[in-house]
From Swiss-Prot:
HAMAP family, A to Z: Ribosomal_bL32
Cysteines joined through disulfide linkages: none
Protein's name according to its UniProt entry: Large ribosomal subunit protein bL32
Alphabetical list of SUPFAM superfamilies matching this protein: Zn-binding ribosomal proteins
Domain of life: Bacteria
Keywords: Ribonucleoprotein, Ribosomal protein
Organism taxonomic ancestry: Bacteria, Pseudomonadati, Thermodesulfobacteriota, Desulfuromonadia, Geobacterales
PANTHER family reported in the protein's UniProt record: 50S RIBOSOMAL PROTEIN L32 (PTHR35534), LARGE RIBOSOMAL SUBUNIT PROTEIN BL32 (PTHR35534:SF1)
Entry keyword Ribonucleoprotein: yes
Keyword field contains Ribosomal protein: yes
An example Gene Ontology molecular-function term: structural constituent of ribosome
InterPro entries for the chain: Ribosomal_bL32, Ribosomal_bL32_bact, Ribosomal_zn-bd
Length: 60
């Protein structure tokens, strides 16, 4: 069974894990109603995507 020859230091362990953090989702602004929305998705408040109504306003 493989066993490490030397102890991994706290600094080396933390440097290895430096890129493992989670990034928050990027929010853009809806050009129609100025509400925050996720990119490449229809606006949840007004139902438009790329200037076209894709979800009817009665459904929202």
């Amino acid at each position: 069974m493989a066993v490490p020859k030397k102890k991994t230091s706290k600094s080396r362990k933390n440097m290895r894990r430096a890129h493992d953090f989670l990034t928050p989702p990027a929010a853009s602004v809806c050009p129609q109603c100025k509400a925050p929305k996720l990119p490449h998705r229809a606006c949840s408040s007004c139902g438009t995507y790329k200037g076209k109504e894709v979800i009817k306003s009665e459904e929202i």
